[in-house]
Amino acid sequence: MDAIKINLDDYELFGGGANGESFNHKTDPTVMLKLYRPGIVQQPLDEITLARKVYEMGISTPEPGDYVTTGDGRYGIRFRRITGKKSYSRATGDEPEKVGQFAREFAGMCLQLHATHVDTTQFENVKERYFRLLGENPFFDAVQKAKLERFIADVPDEDTAIHGDLQYSNAIFVGNERYFIDLGDFCWGNHLFDLGMVYLCCNLSNADFIEETFHMPKSLAIKFWEFFAREYFGPGIPLKEIEELILPFAGLKTLIVERDTKRPMPELRVGLESILS
């Protein structure tokens, strides 16, 4: 797929994250741009390819537009702009008294996503993705990798959708319309792999990161998780039992974080203690 060259002067910055920045078009209110940081080339191409497939499946996500590049060699994607939207992380930070409402709405989106059956010939299996990430990771030794491979292999298979980067900043809403965004890691498999990211973002990440990335204090993020977990799993399962189930899957997200940061993340590996001990 060839990238369309754009002039970044036509866009206005409105936000950013670990991998890139978001822009609105200055004169066309229906267009937004997600631009990756310099040197990130394959991820935007993978994301738009997947985004088109996911959109065609009927999963609620903004309609993807074009694969683009800037004059200085950065790559990104143009999407249909959802005017007036907010992410669930931003909304929670802005209105902390509504944390329960926002967490329950996000949980409802996740339940619907994880009930969606996928044509498994069209997308990657989450286990294969983790096996690949583990093989590429230079920060685990051979014994640790063998234990992690065994854990991943033993997880029961499911043929349902996985977002792949299920942060509460990657779900947006406006009015009664709700959308998932940032679907570059979309795949299929056991839903627990997805829920690990929710737990990591609310509980394992350090307070400064949560404040900067998700616009709220860590204490509020933990409350978000507690409301989310009760809505997702139902009232019959104690929170401690849910967290014991999810913690190793949150720890596995270390493989993604270490891929992106190119350094070991011991503060996140605590989630892997039950596997590696």
Name what the model sees in each region.
Residues 30, 76, 159-161, 178-181, ...:
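Hydrophobic "anchor" residues on beta-strands that sit immediately upstream
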Residues 12-120, 156:
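ATP-binding pocket architecture of kinase catalytic cores
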Residues 83, 166-168, 185, 197:
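Short, glycine/acidic-enriched loop or turn micro-motifs at the edges of active sites
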Residues 195-235, 249-264:
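Active-site activation/catalytic loop segments of kinase-like enzymes and analogous catalytic loops
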Residues 5-13:
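Conserved N-terminal boundary motif of the eukaryotic protein kinase catalytic domain
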Residues 1-2, 115-164, 168-169, 174:
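An alpha-helical support segment within catalytic cores of ATP-dependent transferases
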Residues 171-195:
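Catalytic activation segment of kinase domains across protein kinase-like and atypical kinase folds
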Residues 1-4, 260-277:
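Regulatory N- and C-terminal appendages and interdomain linkers associated
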